[in-house]
Amino acid sequence: MVAATLLVLGFRSLAFTVYTVEGNCLAPVLQQGDRILVNRWSYGLRTGRPDGLFSYGRVFARRVERGDIVAFDSPVDSLPGVLVCRCRALPGDTVRLGQDLLMIPGRTATCAAEDYYWMESLSPASRVDSRVLGPIAESRIVGRVCCVLY
């Protein structure tokens, strides 16, 4: 029984995690209250933390792809927890701010730093994404949303 419990806890913490969607930033794809399964191995197993005791790294690392729906740790203290957005731009991409997608007309932003991604919600009403938070560091990425459980 103890071995089974340890196996389940290890599987849950290392391979998959279930989150509940709060808000409508990815409507109509994800609705408030949906339970989503996040694959923590999608981009490699995350080890350590940039601000932690052990140095950050990824085992079997893979890059986030444009269009992936990604779960990531919030980069600001005022918004604790895990956020979910779609990856819109990759490291090195220039993002045009204004018109139909982003925030300030006539301005640009660059995900120039290595391992930074531009994340956007699908809902124009939601601003809890890179338009407010800025590019998201790869070290904050938890994993890729692989399915809606219920």
PLM features per residue range, with description:
Residues 1-150:
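Extended hydrophobic leader/signal-anchor segments used for secretion and membrane insertion
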